[in-house]
């Protein structure tokens, strides 16, 4: 017996609005310049409208609407901070999205 979980279109639209880039710019996230935060989602504010849920040890759900891509990263990084892996994780997610966009 499979259960289905659906997120309402209204909830997704609310998340996609993003948060205040001005407020976020005052935070301590140097790798995330130009981003915002809304409803527990980190908004890249990139051309693809990508957004991500981030766990403290590198767990990630990365959604890129333009590339029709969802990446789920299960992780247990020894450092309890995403800044420990952002330098390679974030460019990797973008590279996969860029590649997928070339295949459409």
Predicted regions and their residues:
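Active-site Gly/Thr loop motif
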Residues: 1-6, 10-70
């Amino acid at each position: 017996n499979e259960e289905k979980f659906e997120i309402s279109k209204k909830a997704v639209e609310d998340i996609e609005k993003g948060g205040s880039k001005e407020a976020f710019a005052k935070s301590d996230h140097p790798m995330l310049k130009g981003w915002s935060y809304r409803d527990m989602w980190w908004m890249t504010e990139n051309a693809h409208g990508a957004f991500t849920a981030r766990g403290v040890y590198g767990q990630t759900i990365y959604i890129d609407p333009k590339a029709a891509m969802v990446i789920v990263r299960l992780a247990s990084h020894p450092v309890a901070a995403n800044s420990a892996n952002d330098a390679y994780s974030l460019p990797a997610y973008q590279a996969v999205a860029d590649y997928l966009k070339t295949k459409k």
